[in-house]
Amino acid sequence: MGRYYWGDIEGKFWFGVQSSSDVENLINITAQPGNMIWQGCGCVVDFDQKNDEYCKDCYDSKEAFLDEMGEEFEGDPYDELPEISYNITDDSLEDLCDALTKLEKEIDPRIVTEYKKIDGDMSNAFSGVFKQVDELVGIILKEKENMDLQVIARYGLGLQIKQCLEKNGSCGLYCEL
């Protein structure tokens, strides 16, 4: 259970804590809609294909497409995926650093210190790079009842984006809705 993000960085949004558009709380950016996929085959619709009636890579004719879809088929031949995307450029780096500095003031200093100990690649949150931080959050949660997990989750996402921008100059990101 939970929603994922992927692209130049990857991970999972904190369940019940973090929205799919949390990037917008770090920098001034608006999400782009997700990809469109053809019904039937699931291929991604290219922008110049939006006026087509079926995927021409997978079907020889509209009739072949309709045969597979069934005679009851109505509506658009493609669906929008339940995702949003961001193309973050290094123009946002200064604003991101300012946001991270503000977040640090709201987070238990032990957690910030643990995050700052990470000197390796943070692009893949599934690699265990945040394991020490996660364990510390669990310990501190037992001490403090009203710790703002949303701020901690946002800070971790922001650090991933920051490292990606510093390394690549941009950060492309898809977020599951």
Regions found by a protein language model. Give the residues of each.
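Acidic (Asp/Glu-rich) sequence patches and key acidic residues
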Residues: 1-167, 175-177
